UniProtKB/Swiss-Prot annotation:
Pfam families: PRTP
A GO CC term attached to the entry: host cell nucleus
Principal cellular location given in the protein's record: host cell
The protein's name: Tripartite terminase subunit 1
Region annotated Disordered, chain positions: 231-254, 394-423
A GO term for molecular function: zinc ion binding
Recorded superkingdom: Viruses
BP terms from Gene Ontology: viral DNA genome packaging
Job description of the protein: Component of the molecular motor that translocates viral genomic DNA in empty capsid during DNA packaging. Forms a tripartite terminase complex together with TRM2 and TRM3 in the host cytoplasm. Once the complex reaches the host nucleus, it interacts with the capsid portal vertex. This portal forms a ring in which genomic DNA is translocated into the capsid. TRM1 carries an endonuclease activity that plays an important role for the cleavage of concatemeric viral DNA into unit length genomes.
Subunit relationships: Associates with TRM2 and TRM3 to form the tripartite terminase complex. Interacts with portal protein.
InterPro entries the record matches: UL28/UL56
Amino acid sequence: MSGLLAAAYSQVYALAVELSVCTRLDPRSLDVAAVVRNAGLLAELEAILLPRLRRQNDRACSALSLELVHLLENSREASAALLAPGRKGTRVPPLRTPSVAYSVEFYGGHKVDVSLCLINDIEILMKRINSVFYCMSHTMGLESLERALDLLGRFRGVSPIPDPRLYITSVPCWRCVGELMVLPNHGNPSTAEGTHVSCNHLAVPVNPEPVSGLFENEVRQAGLGHLLEAEEKARPGGPEEGAVPGPGRPEAEGATRALDTYNVFSTVPPEVAELSELLYWNSGGHAIGATGQGEGGGHSRLSALFARERRLALVRGACEEALAGARLTHLFDAVAPGATERLFCGGVYSSSGDAVEALKADCAAAFTAHPQYRAILQKRNELYTRLNRAMQRLGRGEEEASRESPEVPRPAGAREPGPSGALSDALKRKEQYLRQVATEGLAKLQSCLAQQSETLTETLCLRVWGDVVYWELARMRNHFLYRRAFVSGPWEDRRAGEGAAFENSKYIKTHLFTQTLSSEHLHALTHSLYTFITGPLAEESGLFPPPSNVALARCCDAAGTLPHQKAFLTSLIWPGIEPSDWIETSFNSFYSVPGGSLASSQQILCRALREAVLTVSLYNKTWGRSLILRRADAVSPGQALPPDGLYLTYDSDRPLILLYKGRGWVFKDLYALLYLHLQMRDDSA
């Protein structure tokens, strides 16, 4: 079934992408018959699939099914907008973004006002509800999630690219927190390090692909290559963009003059052979020609990129005249970005990555335009170095051949006497100093360019919708849906609290007050308690699932839990804890919350969960039973027969359900339930 759902999703997703492009094109360029045909097929698919998807999502949902519902609804609206009778010309998308504000209700009558304006707001709401899920009934949870899901559907639209105004990459999501927890935090919460993290999960960056040349290929495939040739002929000539400089003209000419005395009858020394080979292999270089100009021939890469955009726009107009008989006005023609804006949004024939690379090249060219830096760069060129060494060896060989008597060598480090020696030494020191300054400057330049280009690329790169928000919504919805399905089962109601139930509860409490828990088991019981207050988002299956305390810490860090609240959770169980510390003397009031703040309600309910964990463990030890405490959301709605045990439903009205051999009983008092379990003969729960 999941394969069929994925197949339907892929087809609807492809249609949504095409619709998002069509909304930005000139209506005259659209094939109305094809749009009508696709709209009819979409209506057919929606009539068959959408009602079933909604029924399925009311029982158990997935990120794929939730997004598919949104794509079906939004594609229907986009198709209707394309076929609107009064649609003329291109329409600029509205700048207004949807938002919603409502109150989230918790136990004790406490309400929290939330305002959702961004995709991050929805994701943050999921993390916060995940940390206090046990403070809400399934009705409260589903109502709060439904409003957020509706807003996410309006955010989703039909475009695979989310509106950049709807998300912030500097806010870590649930998966970012999980990645940060792998790194050492030196005792600090993961959210403290999250301020320096760029989230790539809400909006996933797309790997940059070459854009240059795609339009030209499409034109040639349409049989209009002559238009490109006409544009190339009209383009003014100039040096090739991005040419890398080699050794300068003086070095090349000097090497050529040094080789003029050799011919096929000459004896060729090794130095001459190496010099000739170097000139041969560099004969195709750009810098040994007649230009002698710097990198890029003195032209700006960014200006060349923008000029190419203008030239290809003219070619596109000529293609439209040849194919459609008239020039069309699309959205990117009606609202053309300026030079500065194009740095952020890219162009039709180039991406923002191309603009970043061109800007990086221009910055480097501007820095190296200084004559001193150019000289240093030239001397660092490998070909220049080898050429100079070969010429020096050749010069030394000629001098040794013509020298009659060797000169008396001077000691190392000695300089020629007189003003000329001092001046030569000063010039060498100056050259060495400038070389060192240039080397350090180039190193800093490369580091700065790499860092800034990485930041720009990460900020301006194309991003598509991620699945993390839909995944979180599906997890949280399934939690509350499973709870609703479980408490709605055909269980016998024992919440009345008649006189016999009070005596039964008193009997169990009296016996448990005289017992103690083994100190060796307290550590395991602490982790067991953590599993009952850990949110549904942390329920990850795999070969190496995280420990319960790590999963709980991730929930707290993601939700922004305060340190003193974390300390309260870790202090629920301590060494030497006695039954009188956790057993409540009241009757038939388990998981009841009086009015108060959310923080006080959270503490009361955590103590109630602690009471259930420790009491069941002490009960099994005292009477030799094997009652297992379970979570109600662990039972899927389609599961035929849940395993026996005591289920915590997190529902204030029906908090405890005992299952035994296919039968179930609903209790409001924990100890009356244990008394019923004690009466059962064959204990397999």
